[in-house]
Regions:
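Extreme N-terminal, non-catalytic leader segments
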Residues: 1-25
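Small-molecule kinase domains that catalyze NTP-dependent phosphoryl transfer to phosphate-bearing small molecules
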Residues: 106-107, 128, 133, 157-190
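Short beta-strand-centered segment that lines the nucleotide-binding/catalytic pocket of NTP-utilizing
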Residues: 49-62
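P-loop (Walker A) phosphate-binding loop of NTP-binding proteins
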Residues: 31
């Protein structure tokens, strides 16, 4: 079953109305160029809260080993994301965001994000099993291959499109399939 935006928003609102002071963590995973960032921004605009981007958690240079890059779901720094984002949020603490910057893949301080009850984690690999399911809600956003190609071409250009097609899209698809990501998420109509 695919949910509408309003149905997803209503579910998030219900979690936020709980008297419980625990954080509401929402994950938005799915294909690259499917609309994850757009969905996160819309939820934030309508409901408030924070948005954290998995794209800030690329592997650093020293982590880019053959073994790590062969690992299903291994081309994101899931250890650092859990330590720097998920663990502080579960304790109701602010989060210091250090983005991994191209082309040298070194960490650069970006900002400190104050704690809010609603925290939206968006990006491929946001539902990685390493995180031990900290989310109240997991959403999967999907786009067909042709739509992906057109959006990536427009957003990233022809040269990067080839890298997406040959490298990143196959890695994502392997992660979705082997870790049953889509099956463990609500799916949204975009």
């Amino acid at each position: 079953m695919k949910y509408s935006y309003d149905e997803i928003k209503n579910l998030v609102e219900k979690y936020m109305q709980d008297e419980d002071e625990s954080p509401v963590l929402i994950a938005i995973d799915g294909n690259c160029a499917a609309g994850k960032t757009t969905l996160a921004a819309r939820l934030q605009s309508d409901l408030g809260g924070n948005v954290f981007h998995m794209d800030d958690y690329y592997l650093q240079s020293f982590q880019r080993t053959k073994e790590r890059l062969r690992e299903t779901g291994g081309n994101v720094d899931y250890e650092r994301f859990k330590k720097e984002v998920i663990e502080p949020l579960k304790k109701g603490e602010a989060v210091g965001v250090y983005a991994c910057i191209h082309p040298d893949f070194v960490l650069e301080y970006r900002e400190t994000i104050e704690y809010k009850k609603l925290n939206i984690i968006e990006g491929s690999y946001s539902c990685h099993p390493y995180f031990d399911s900290p989310y109240k809600l997991q959403i999967f956003v999907e786009a067909g291959f042709e739509v992906q190609v057109e959006r990536i071409r427009k957003r990233n250009g022809e040269v990067m499109l080839q890298r997406f097609i040959n490298e990143w899209i196959p890695k994502e698809n392997e992660y979705f399939r082997k870790m049953k990501i889509k099956e463990n998420c609500l799916q949204i109509k975009m």
